[in-house]
Curated annotation (Swiss-Prot):
SS bond list: C27-C39, C33-C44
Protein's name according to its UniProt entry: Peptide HSTX-I
Propeptide cleavage-removed residue intervals: 22-28
A single Gene Ontology CC term: extracellular region
Main location: secreted
Keyword Ligase: no
Subcellular location: Secreted
Family statement: Belongs to the annelide toxin family.
Organism: Haemadipsa sylvestris (Indian leech)
Length: 49
């Protein structure tokens, strides 16, 4: 049970790291940003609200 919890936390941490890289990455088209991100003025922006 504890191993599963650690794995879950690690997966979330990695997802956040990847998300931060995507947000900082320059983009030309909206699909380059991945899920739940928009391309605004060449920057991947998280979709909030």
């Amino acid at each position: 049970m504890r191993t599963l919890l650690v794995f879950l936390l690690l997966a979330i941490f990695v997802a956040v790291l990847i998300g931060n890289v995507q947000v900082e990455a320059a983009c030309k088209e909206y699909w380059e940003c991945g899920a739940f991100l928009f391309c605004i003025e060449g920057i991947c922006v998280p979709m909030i609200g």
